[in-house]
Amino acid sequence: MHLRNVPTCPEILGEAALANEPDIKQVFITGFTETETADRKLYLIRKRIENKVRLSAIPTRNDFYVVSLSTKSIIYKGMLSSLQLRNYYPDLTNSYFTSGLALVHSRFSTNTFPTWGLAQPFRLLAHNGEINTIRGNRGWMEARESVLSTPVSYTHLRAHETL
């Protein structure tokens, strides 16, 4: 495992973004032999970390957010315009880093106060509209949990349980 401080250029941020700029780290975990198994393990690791932080006495626990922990993607996000992104993250202009795909989403929230954690993209989606019914969507999914299935059988994957 390697922990990396992500290089940033905070001087390009606006006043609100700078006042709330998070500490940005990247974790690289090696030793996996199969991508599918690695993704499952990384998911469980992420959930365990999130639950431990959520249940801790850390004063900034409500601001903690794992942007990505995946074999497939690295996400760079912030309270930034798309033009600011490459200037804020020098990695994005470093020729050492290559990518087969880049997705930039720059729409700002219209009915919630902007925060780093709510900035686009999220781990699994970027969208062009507000998702106003998160509570409703969670309730809908929880009501159908008993009919959901996966070929991988482990019952401890419920996101709201402590791992």
Which positions does each model-derived feature cover?
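Extended, highly charged
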Residues: M1-G100, V104-T110, L157-R158
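Short, small/polar residue-rich loop motifs at catalytic or cofactor-binding pockets
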Residues: L118-A119
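Conserved phosphate/anionic-ligand binding catalytic regions in large, soluble enzymes, centered on
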Residues: F122-W140
